A protein has these predicted regions:
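Short beta-strand/loop motif that positions the catalytic acidic residue
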Residues: 234, 240-242
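Flexible "cap/lid" loop of the alpha/beta hydrolase fold
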Residues: 133, 142-171
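Conserved HGGG/HGGXW glycine-rich cap/lid loop of the alpha/beta-hydrolase fold
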Residues: 8-87
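Conserved acidic catalytic loop of the alpha/beta-hydrolase fold
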Residues: 94, 98-116
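Active-site nucleophile elbow and catalytic-triad environment of alpha/beta-hydrolase enzymes
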Residues: 214-230
């Protein structure tokens, strides 16, 4: 089982797709999700087009290390962050987005990769942004997908989406699978697929059911604050992809990200929610390949399809 180790002893399970001779593309998954949430066919399309695709489980998810027993009071973290006391919020959180960004570096180091293109989705986009800010020299480019800047006024979920996101996961397998349909709230209105969501939930449950980890990941996001200043100073080719149907992180989160990063390209995708439906893979893959194949970011706004 391939794993990467951090200096603090965290073990990160990873998988690769494609040829190591191709430009490396690290995919960073989001809140409460395992690497299998990256559709295999999506990754294979990228690999078949000449990218060395790397996927991994964030800490506290999947087959990576779990911080068992590291209790966190998410309400206290939220209160501290909401009051502007990020120092207190970080004291209460077991780790932050910076630590999760360091985990990305550990994966690259394990593979002997000096620099990589990095694509992050949702919380993974936040991690990728943090990584780009703190370790710009390790990135070839950044793709921030369905994510936001950490500024509280942007990318705010609808009440219904937030309630569904924070609902406790049922411990019984069948109930857990049935609850996956709540994800239709933020999925593509045109391509939302309950059966697909339930199939992923079944695979995720059987691979690793670990609801304890989501509280610590939530605390990491809350305690990390705004990345606006770092994004303003970022000198890195950046593509921002956001679905116009997204109710979990609405499009203004992506628009704000692109506004802050100098030279960033913004791609607003019709019929895409907080998901990556298969009918949209070709346009998403084409945009990612185009972006990771150029040396300079070209200011532009795309609307697809």
């Amino acid at each position: 089982m391939p794993t990467a180790a951090t200096p603090t002893g965290i073990e990160l399970y990873y998988e690769t797709i494609g040829s190591p001779a191709d430009p490396p593309l690290l995919l960073v998954m989001g809140y409460g999700s395992q690497l299998i949430a990256w559709p295999r066919g999506f990754s294979e399309l990228l690999a078949a087009s000449g990218r060395f695709v790397i996927v991994f489980d964030n800490r506290d998810s999947g087959l990576s290390s779990k911080l068992d027993g590291a209790a966190v009071d998410t309400e206290a973290v939220m209160a501290a962050a909401g009051a502007g006391d990020l120092a207190r919020a970080r004291e209460l959180a077991p780790y932050t987005l910076s630590d999760l960004a360091d985990d990305c570096i550990a994966v690259l180091d394990a593979l002997g990769i000096d620099r990589a293109h990095v694509l992050g989705a949702s919380m993974g986009g936040m991690i990728a942004q943090q990584l780009a800010i703190e370790r710009t020299e390790r990135l070839l480019s950044l793709v921030s997908m369905m994510s936001t800047t950490g500024e509280p006024e942007y990318g705010r979920p609808t009440p219904e989406a937030l309630e569904a996101l924070l609902s406790p996961s049922p411990p019984e397998r069948e109930a857990y699978i049935a609850s996956a349909g709540e994800g239709l709230i933020w999925a593509s209105r045109r391509y939302g697929d309950r059966a697909r969501l339930e199939a992923l939930a079944a695979e995720s449950y059987d691979r690793c059911f670990y609801p304890e980890g989501v509280d610590r990941q939530l605390a990491a996001m809350l305690a990390s604050g705004s990345r606006a200043d770092g994004l303003r100073a970022l000198e890195l080719p950046t593509l921002v992809i956001h679905g116009l149907d997204d109710k979990l992180i609405p499009p203004d989160g992506g628009e704000r990200t692109a506004e802050l990063v100098p030279g960033a390209r913004l791609m607003l995708v019709e019929d895409m929610g907080h998901d990556r439906p298969e009918p949209l893979w070709p346009v998403l893959v084409e945009a990612i390949l185009d972006h990771t194949g150029r040396e300079e970011a070209i200011p532009n706004i795309l609307r697809a399809p």
